[in-house]
Amino acid sequence: MLGAYLPIIVLVVVAVLFGCGSLIFSSLIGQKKPSVVKMAPYECGCEPVGSARERFSIKFYIIAMLFILFDIEAVFLYPWAVLFKRLGMFGLMEMGVFIVILFVGYIYVWKKGALEWE
C-alpha cells in the first residue's frame, strides 16, 4: 500500500526541502540593506499614486464571493462527469437537484440586485 505512494511522498519531501533550503540559503548570503526606495510599494513600473491601502467598494467582494460560490459548482460537477456511467440514474438525479438548488440561488442573487453594477 505504501509502496504505491512512495514516489509521491519522495517528490513532496524533495520539493519542500528544496524550497526551504533555497529560502534559508538566500537569507544567509543575501544582502540586507533596506532603504526608503526598496520599501516603497511598486506598481507596474510606475510611480505609486495615492495610498496602497485604499478602500474598495463592497460590490467587488460580493462579486468575488459569488464567483467562488458558483465556481465550486464546477469542482462538484467534474467528478460526477467522470463517474457518470457508474453512478447511473441516481447520480443524474442527485446532480440535477444540486444544479436546481444552485440555479435557484442564482435567481435569488439576481432578483436581490447583487449582479447590478451602478
Swiss-Prot record:
Its EC number is 7.1.1.-. It is found in: Cell inner membrane. The chain crosses the membrane at residues 5-25, 62-82, 87-107. One of its GO terms (cellular component) is plasma membrane. It is an enzyme of class 7 (translocase). Keywords: Cell inner membrane, Cell membrane, Membrane, NAD, Quinone, Translocase, Transmembrane, Transmembrane helix, Transport, Ubiquinone. The keyword Cell wall biogenesis/degradation does not apply. Gene3D superfamilies: NADH:ubiquinone/plastoquinone oxidoreductase, chain 3. The keyword Cell cycle does not apply. Signal peptide: none annotated. It is a multi-pass membrane protein. One of its GO terms (molecular function) is quinone binding. InterPro entries: NAD(P)H_OxRDtase_bac/plastid (IPR023043), NADH_UbQ/plastoQ_OxRdtase_su3 (IPR000440), NDAH_ubi_oxred_su3_sf (IPR038430). NDH-1 shuttles electrons from NADH, via FMN and iron-sulfur (Fe-S) centers, to quinones in the respiratory chain. The immediate electron acceptor for the enzyme in this species is believed to be ubiquinone. Couples the redox reaction to proton translocation (for every two electrons transferred, four hydrogen ions are translocated across the cytoplasmic membrane), and thus conserves the redox energy in a proton gradient. This is NADH-quinone oxidoreductase subunit A 2. It comes from Geotalea uraniireducens (strain Rf4) (Geobacter uraniireducens). The gene is nuoA2.
